[in-house]
Amino acid sequence: GYGYECDNNTIRNCKLGPNVAAEHVDIKEYTTGTTVENCTFDGTGMSGENYAKSFINIKGNDCVIRNNIGYRNGCTAIQRAIEQNNVADGWGQNAMVYGNKVYMDTATNALGKKMYFLNAWDCSATVWDNFMAYDGELFSVDNEDDQWDYYNCNLLTYGNK
């Protein structure tokens, strides 16, 4: 295993990809305070190893995901931009996700399901100022009336812009 005392890490100004085997960033359970900011994710050649389906997988608490850009680039392994999981009781909570832009190529994934910006069932997240493009221009995904179009999250809060 790995050491669980891996808190308050910052991943900043990185270009990750192409040819990444699994998620570009995988924030593990039992970690707190991870920040991922100002990074670029290139999905080209991602193999989807270990069931990877997103640019970022959040399993830790109190994470900040901000000002990143993700390009799916036709990679069928990427089925959503960000995944948030509670694989251990009390974990995968309190994420702040804002100022991100993702280019997903299509509105549906390889399984014919909706291409969500954030998939985070039973995980709390606060979001604002996020944008997505399917096959064209970026659009805001932060309209509360359309939450279920872009955020598959039953514990979602919209923050202030």
What residues fall within each predicted segment?
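Right-handed parallel beta-helix
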Residues: 1-26, 31-46, 53-55, 60-74, ...
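Structural detector of coil-to-beta-strand junctions
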Residues: 22-26, 47-48, 53-55, 76-86, ...
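A short, acidic, flexible beta-alpha connecting loop/helix-capping segment that sits on the rim
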Residues: 144-146
